[in-house]
Amino acid sequence: MFVVTNRITVKKGFAEKMAPRFTKGGKIEALQGFHKIEVWKVTRDHENEDMYVNTWWETEKDFEAWTKSDAFKEAHQNRDKTSSESSPVISSEIVKATVLSTLN
């Protein structure tokens, strides 16, 4: 199992507003190797909020295929559009990991 986490720091009050954007569904569910998406709000003591958008894939190759797909482009096409409001996103970092052990 391969997990990709997008660690996103947003302005306070925006994590819960933004979370549904990542789990509204779309073409990603039909892609080979896709398992699920979870969005976590990370508890920290500072002025911003941290979200971890976690996607589970069968293999890293499956994830890489997603990033090169038309479905990926469609899912990300509106995020760079200019609006009258400034973006609530302060920073983001992608972390890739292979699951080595699990207890259910």
UniProtKB/Swiss-Prot annotation:
Cross-referenced SUPFAM superfamilies: Dimeric alpha+beta barrel
HAMAP family registered for this protein in UniProt: Heme_degrading_monooxygenase (MF_01272)
Stretches assigned to the ABM domain: 2-94
Residues with site note (Transition state stabilizer): 66
Enzyme class: oxidoreductase
One biological process term in Gene Ontology: heme catabolic process
Main location: cytoplasm
Annotated catalysed reactions: heme b + 5 AH2 + 4 O2 + 2 H(+) = delta-staphylobilin + Fe(2+) + formaldehyde + 5 A + 4 H2O; heme b + 5 AH2 + 4 O2 + 2 H(+) = beta-staphylobilin + Fe(2+) + formaldehyde + 5 A + 4 H2O
A molecular function GO annotation: heme binding
Record-linked InterPro entries: ABM_dom, Dimeric_a/b-barrel, Heme-degrading_MO, IsdG
A GO CC term attached to the entry: cytoplasm
Residues engaged in binding Fe cation: 6
Originating organism: Staphylococcus haemolyticus (strain JCSC1435)
Entry function: Allows bacterial pathogens to use the host heme as an iron source. Catalyzes the oxidative degradation of the heme macrocyclic porphyrin ring to the oxo-bilirubin chromophore staphylobilin (a mixture of the linear tetrapyrroles 5-oxo-delta-bilirubin and 15-oxo-beta-bilirubin) in the presence of a suitable electron donor such as ascorbate or NADPH--cytochrome P450 reductase, with subsequent release of free iron.
Binding site for heme: 76
E.C. numbers: 1.14.99.48
Name of the featured protein: Heme oxygenase (staphylobilin-producing)
Assembly, per entry: Homodimer.
Cited PROSITE patterns: ABM
